């Protein structure tokens, strides 16, 4: 799909090109109380009051998400007009904007339009420029057009005909909007990769499949990929990681993906993704109902690969290292048992009280491995705890960090990217719940504050660099009729890296 930018100040009568230019449809916003947006006012004048008459007649009341097509409109170059309800003007925020653009795309994709002129990006949203509106609109469109068909014997053909979108933006935002287009397309491509990996079944997306995906990314984008096998993992003494992998016939893989966009000596940002390609719970077996969704337990790994793909396409001027410990968590005759004690790469011994708390066991060795890169910061991403879903639901990812500056950067990025996160506590008092009579620490801390104690466990392995943890158990995928991976938190991570790169 082709996206282009055209500057236009509707309030100064600069709309002639939009009024006369050929297009299948022009998209206009209407607020409640019969208030026309700036672009709608100009179109109303050009069509001799048509928009006003439609609104006055009650055919378009401006309620958020409502849409109305006006066919065969005379006086303008577009063959039809799509009116989109924006809701109340004094309550128009990021969510209202996203609701409006999503409604617009759904209406357009159900038609045979090929080229669209899109004016909604110029609407004022929380003091953001129209470049932000362009990026959000493209991501919303790509979300609506995403389909996972790889496992279908006869995939349904693409039904929409939309091929080109022209965004009208404020003239002062034109340059930034062109950058936003590039970033949005790269980001959407990264999210699509993350979603594809998550949606693949566990018998296809194995640890080896993830490793091969990383190798292909490196080949496609001029990066370096290292994949460590069982013997190399054993040589590194990653006993905690190996304790999870031992009962599966699928060999574990330890993936390291290097993106170099800055000088080789520049300290990298390290992203560590949990890569459990299927999680039965091990000997602490999960209930059968809903276990199919445990193919999504590698979405942390998928988000690392998707983020680095987006970073490479954007050409960000910084260094990023992706680390992915990946394996299956299976029961078996040689599986780790509750009560077993294992030794981590760091040398700390861990009493495994519950084999279904396995994500932290593979991540702790990866976090220790990350030290060798002398990182500027390390962020781990994991579908780690059901407790995080209880605490935050499916809207916010859980953010944990003792570094206020790093946490602040990530929260700012989450707001800018419309990929929300919420900071949860990481007080030392919670560490007491991880005490063990038989090892240096236990892998679970009981029912209270389960997501917090999981983060506390990881913090024991991150003392030598700035670190943050994102628990995406509630946000990495959706259940029910809309079941599927979401691609989150790729937008948050990519925005954080864009900000760090100063781009």
From Swiss-Prot:
SUPFAM superfamilies: Macro domain-like, Zn-dependent exopeptidases. Keywords: Aminopeptidase, Cytoplasm, Hydrolase, Manganese, Metal-binding, Protease. InterPro entries: Leucine_aapep/pepB, Macro_dom-like, Peptidase_M17_C, Peptidase_M17_leu_NH2_pept, Peptidase_M17_N. Its main location: cytoplasm. It is found in: Cytoplasm. Disulfide bonds: none annotated. The active site is at 286, 360. It catalyses: Release of an N-terminal amino acid, Xaa-|-Yaa-, in which Xaa is preferably Leu, but may be other amino acids including Pro although not Arg or Lys, and Yaa may be Pro. Amino acid amides and methyl esters are also readily hydrolyzed, but rates on arylamides are exceedingly low; Release of an N-terminal amino acid, preferentially leucine, but not glutamic or aspartic acids. Mn(2+) 1 binds at residues 279, 356, 358. Belongs to the peptidase M17 family. This is Probable cytosol aminopeptidase. The gene is pepA.
